[in-house]
């Protein structure tokens, strides 16, 4: 990825060692039918599909590069783990989440199926459990990118830092006084 490149669609399969060919295949078929839309596709351990001019496929990206691409994207599609979902939300993008399935060898079990259903019930992700749902969400997101924009969500990080500071700062102040 070159600095300054913008991809309207960013897809991440995460860093799990299991391949995720189902999601990669769905996105690849969509991209082949939409050659005018640039896609950044982070593959992880999934085998790269046939190259398309509109798709920049990479095994892994440095975390800061992936998050920066998410911030510039109209649509972020993430596997159903908390890392990619929270990264997208942290930069103001409500992701389309596609859970990995244990019965397909995409993960050890179906915890992503349960997790993404829980997130979707609370309006925190758009859930796509099959190709038709993914394409519907993807097309709707490109037609109206505002529907996938949210205020940047730092999650509990800010609260955790505040609580940490409340405990540590008095300890440091006491230590300084006792020197």
Question: What spans do the regions from the language model cover?
Answer:
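Hydrophobic beta-strand scaffold residues
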Residues: 39, 95, 126-127
